């Protein structure tokens, strides 16, 4: 079954735009990591005493949700995370320095993927307009590379979250309280995963278009 270039162009434009919008939304929102302490705040006297000592100066709920740049409490303004690129004048432990390095890695990789998609969109438009085989091939490879950058950024974020959880676990004296805390990844991370899939499909569409154009030119030469 032959696939027309027009159909591939439409598919590439749709999936490429979807990938860009979803990744931009994921980067700009603060629901990558969610900590829900509602069950803990409603539990027995021991936890109430601990939470009471914490809440004397801050009576609002302890639940929070975090993004790539900041963390937000339910009834408090969002606070920015520590800048991972200014470590020279900061004294931190080796584990904290490793966390900051991981933080700096994914805040570079994910916006970089957006930039690659912008360049891919421009070269993709020109490649379909000019019907240039090499440009179609280059654009497909560019989108696939961008998808790998997105995957790397998301993977580093997941590893960063796990390492931060282990660090908090080591510092927490009442480890049993974590059984009453619901910790999960949020919908911002889900948008990142969907963007990664759409970016893969965009790259595949451009490579399929390059192959279709090559086959068409071979047939024309044979005639």
From Swiss-Prot:
Spans traversing the lipid bilayer: 7-27, 106-126, 134-154, 189-209
The keyword Cytoplasm belongs to this UniProt entry's keyword annotation: no
UniProt keyword list: Cell junction, Cell membrane, Chromosomal rearrangement, Glycoprotein, Membrane, Tight junction, Transmembrane, Transmembrane helix
Annotated localization: Cell junction, Tight junction; Lateral cell membrane; Apical cell membrane
Keyword field contains Cell inner membrane: no
Signal peptide: none
UniProt-annotated glycosylation sites, renumbered to this chain: 55, 89
Family: Belongs to the PMP-22/EMP/MP20 family.
Protein name according to UniProt: Transmembrane protein 114
Native source species: Homo sapiens
């Amino acid at each position: 079954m032959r696939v027309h270039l027009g159909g591939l162009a439409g598919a590439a434009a749709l999936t490429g735009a979807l990938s860009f919008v979803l990744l931009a939304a994921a980067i700009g929102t603060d629901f990558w990591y969610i900590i829900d302490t509602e069950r803990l705040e409603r539990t027995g006297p021991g936890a109430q005493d601990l939470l009471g000592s914490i809440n004397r100066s801050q009576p609002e709920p302890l639940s929070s949700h975090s993004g790539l740049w900041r963390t937000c409490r339910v009834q408090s303004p969002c606070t920015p995370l520590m800048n991972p690129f200014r470590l020279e004048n900061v004294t931190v432990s080796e584990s904290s320095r490793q966390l900051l390095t991981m933080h700096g890695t994914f805040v570079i990789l994910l916006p970089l993927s957006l930039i690659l998609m912008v360049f891919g969109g421009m070269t993709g438009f020109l490649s379909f307009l000019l019907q240039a085989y090499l440009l179609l091939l280059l654009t497909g490879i560019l989108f696939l590379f961008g998808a790998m950058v997105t995957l790397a950024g998301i993977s580093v974020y997941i590893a960063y979250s796990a390492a931060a959880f282990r660090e908090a676990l080591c510092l927490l004296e009442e480890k049993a309280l974590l059984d009453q805390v619901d910790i999960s990844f949020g919908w911002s991370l889900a948008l990142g995963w969907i963007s990664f899939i759409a970016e893969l499909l965009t790259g595949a569409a451009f490579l399929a278009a390059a192959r279709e154009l090559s086959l068409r030119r071979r047939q024309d030469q044979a005639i």
